[in-house]
A protein has these predicted regions:
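HIT superfamily nucleotide-processing domains
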Residues: 1-274
Length: 274
């Protein structure tokens, strides 16, 4: 898989050998190792028919959409189902999730919390019986955001899902709002995190709790929308101009983002931006 495939999701590459299965069966195996993912090279012989992950709690007879995934898009699934083969890429493993760095981060800090349930390819597959899993994913993502804030209190984080991800296997983005990254190169990258295409985790949990499923904003038009600053909403003609502006923009975040815990930030940043 190469970055030229132009997908908003990223994954890690190298993989590892043994994991302590006994510890995994006993419960959470939480290692918050301060390591960087070295990237992941997808191996087609890494069984997509693996039984290592959890079985989905519901089947596809409920009308959820199915999608054909290319071989490169299977990498997150392979890691989630057999994380013991990818230890060098994984930051944390539990019975429910794995956490890893995005291979092509779109900000200073950008990690993925990946569900380990079979059959949950994307947000469209989520139903009410998966609510506890969503809460677990959110709690893990929040823990990592707070860890990063402890290291750098100037950062601000947002937790959420792409309405239609490019990589198979349900995953939560934990991404800092500086968007300071050489990997953020085009309109699709920006708009996948800064339009309604990006669904905040807190809203997804509320919708699934109330309606049994999340609202998807997966229209292709959202990824080609006009480039706008996520803080002051000013329009910009291209990514270089936008990124230059974002670096210096000190406007308050939109009020909608400052509500319901959609942003994770330190108290000092609340007083500045709210």
């Amino acid at each position: 898989m190469t970055e030229s495939q132009d997908h908003p999701d990223g994954i890690p590459k190298d993989h590892f050998t043994n994991s302590d299965q006994k510890n995994k069966r006993k419960g959470l195996h939480k290692s918050e190792r301060s390591k960087r993912s070295k990237g992941y090279r997808d191996e087609t012989d890494d069984a997509s028919d693996s039984n290592a992950g959890k079985v989905n709690l519901s089947n596809k007879s409920d009308g959820s959409r199915t999608k054909s995934w290319g071989s490169w898009a299977q990498a997150l699934y392979n890691i989630a189902m057999q994380p013991e083969k990818h230890r060098d890429a994984v930051l944390e493993i539990s019975d429910d999730v794995v956490v890893l760095n995005d291979l092509y981060p779109k900000a200073q800090r950008h990690v993925l919390v990946v569900a380990r349930y079979e059959g949950l390819d994307c947000l469209a597959d989520v139903r009410k019986e998966h609510l506890q899993l969503l809460r677990t994913m959110h709690a893990v993502g929040l823990k990592w955001a707070e860890k990063f804030l402890h290291d750098d209190s100037s950062l601000v984080f947002r937790l959420g899902y792409h309405s239609e991800p490019s990589m198979r296997q349900l995953h939560l983005h934990v991404i800092s709002q500086d968007f300071d990254s050489t990997h953020l190169k085009n309109k699709k990258h920006w708009n996948s995190f800064n339009t309604a295409f990006f669904r905040d985790s807190v809203d997804v949990m509320e919708e699934v709790s109330s309606n049994g499923k999340a609202i998807l904003k997966d229209e292709d038009s959202m990824l080609s929308m006009e480039l706008r600053c996520h803080r002051c909403r000013s329009a910009h003609p291209n990514i270089p101009r936008l990124k230059s502006h974002v670096t210096n923009c000190r406007a308050s975040f939109p009020s909608t983002l400052l509500q319901k815990g959609r942003l994770v930030l330190t108290p000092c940043n609340v007083s500045i931006d709210a």
